[in-house]
Amino acid sequence: GFVRQAGRKEETVTITTLQEFDPEQVDMFTVVLIGNSQSYYREGKLITPRGYYREKTTDATGIGQEIMINSFRTIEKELKNKNIPSDHKWALLHAIHTTADFEMENILHIDPLAVECLYKILNEGKVRTIITDVTMAAAGIRKGALERMGIGVKCYLGDERAAALAKEKGITRTQAGIRMAAEEHPEALYVFGNAPTALMELCDLIRKEKAHPCGIIAAPVGFVHVCESKHMVKPFSHIPKLIVEGRKGGS
């Protein structure tokens, strides 16, 4: 990139590539900024990370972080909407990174201030338990972050009591699991990555004031009751929510 008349009223900034660069645009009043292979473009700025770039690293954690960072950069470059608010973008990047599905840009519904609110209560230690509908959703939550924040994750799907309750009441096991979870952890953060009947059960419990979730992540997937369950959870405006709309979702 290059800056003409830097610091003056006539200042102009141009971001370009070596292939498209026109030397005729540069004169004695121009400052030229040269990036490297790690430089990237974001919000009208050319950003080059500080430090020395290593082609290879033997640290497993470093390799994983490097892959994630490069993945996020790739995703951000391919987003159609370049003016997404930072809190929405943070959640969207993770959703696309997990699914490799850029339709998330259109179907990920985020309540106003939901990400900010959830981030705040998580970091303030106000969330002690996360409830998931299935074990796969529980397995996908980073263990290191949970340990650092002192948060426990519970899934009642494999609980014998849930199986017995499901048989007795004629409901699904995930539905029974959420019913049990609401009795023991009514104010938990509830995460759904598979079962629409479980999300519908939570909605029913909220209406009956038997559950008071501090937040809801609603991403059940499939063809039966999926869209209906997501429509049911939307009206609870007092609860911060992230919803993958339509049939898509997943743990």
Which sequence ranges carry the predicted segments?
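Electropositive, gly/pro-rich neighborhoods at or near active sites that engage anionic ligands
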Residues: D59-R128
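Short Gly/Pro-enriched loop/turn and capping motifs at secondary-structure junctions
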Residues: A6-E10, S37-Y40, A195-A198, V221-V224, ...
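Conserved mixed alpha/beta catalytic, RNA-binding, or beta-rich assembly cores of soluble enzyme
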Residues: V134-I206, P213-G215, P220-G222, V226, ...
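General beta-strand structural signal in soluble alpha/beta enzymes
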Residues: F2, I130-T132, C155, V191-F192, ...
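A structural signal for small-residue-enriched, beta-sheet-centric alpha/beta enzyme cores
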Residues: P220-S251
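Short coil/turn connectors at secondary-structure junctions
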Residues: V26-F29, G125-R128, R148-G152, E184-A188, ...
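A contiguous loop/helix-start segment that scaffolds small-molecule binding in enzyme catalytic cores
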Residues: G1-D59
